[in-house]
Amino acid sequence: MKAIVYRDFGSPDVLRVEDVEKPTPADDEVLVAVHAAGVNMFDWYMVRGKPFVFRLVLGPGRQKPLGVDLSGVVEAVGRNVTRFKPGDEVFGTGRDKMRAKRGSFAEYVSAPEKILAVKPRNVSFEQAAGVPVAGLTALQGLRNHGLLRSGQKVLVNGASGGVGTFAVQIAKAFGANVTGVCSTRNVEMVKGIGADHVIDYTRESFTSGAVRYDVILDIVGNQSWAECRRMLTDSGKYIAAGGPPRRALPLMLREPFTRGKLVTFVARANLADLNVMRQLIEDGRVTPVVDRTYPLEETAEAVRYVAAGHTRGKVVIKVR
């Protein structure tokens, strides 16, 4: 089968399409014929090998797969799999933790049953492929860590990107009053997906306003913690869900001393939350926004586009 692999760390130019062995599902795994695969900033960090821990885990020189999000059709199942059968349409993640043998930028992936769910019936494979990492980051950030409740004020910094477009819609579905931060060209799009207010960051900073927020979900990480803290209500929470890797460690070290106002986290794929996203999508309360699609052969260009940090929704690799 064809798959995207890389051996050295660097720019997207290190990515290659190669013929690799088609996987065989283990007892608890599902073999999926991949139709589409979502591209995430995480993929770019993997290719760069930054933060440095990625280089230690993945190792230099050896063949490495790429890609996390996927949607497709079940081709075969392991003997212990009970929820799926061949022909079922699924979405989820191809990686359980950082197992190097798996990557969703491929024609087939053998993935654990526990991180796959039935694909939402009312969206395309391309739309479904963009949901897992970005959708669960938005969901878990707002619900689990922001403890979002109906009627609260939420600010999403990076509202027009992959995570942000989900966050705006999820916050609205939860009954929040939502402010989105984006550039001029994306203002109308962010309004269109449900934001009550939009701040154009090319004209003003969200940290200079008078409004205080119950939850700030920050996907961009372009403002200091001190500046963001001033924008919170007394019980408000600042959720760091993205930004440059170099920013993560200082925030993590500061987190224990903020009395719960600062939270850093990485989303965890799980069946329950994939099903929450599926229900939100099938109910029409969340619609995955796809910016661009690329064929498998142009994965390097897709990663390059995501790395630039100006996507409008999700970028997806169309495999079939």
Model-derived segments and spans:
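Glycine-rich phosphate-binding loop and adjacent beta-alpha segment
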Residues: 182, 219-286, 319-320
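C-terminal hydrophobic helical "lid"/dimerization subdomain
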Residues: 270-320
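Glycine-rich beta-strand-centered segment in the early N-terminal region that forms part
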Residues: 21-39, 51-97
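A short acidic, Gly/Pro-enriched loop at the edge of an enzyme's catalytic core
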Residues: 207-215
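NAD(P)H dinucleotide-binding glycine-rich loop of Rossmann-like/cofactor-binding domains
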Residues: 45, 60, 68, 83, ...
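Short glycine-centered segments of the SAM/dcSAM-binding site in methyltransferase folds
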Residues: 89, 153, 177, 236-237, ...
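N-terminal Rossmann-like NAD(P) cofactor-binding module of classical short-chain dehydrogenase/reductase
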Residues: 91, 199, 216-217, 239
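Mid-domain Rossmann-like dinucleotide-binding core that forms the NAD(H)/NADP(H) cofactor-binding site
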Residues: 128-200
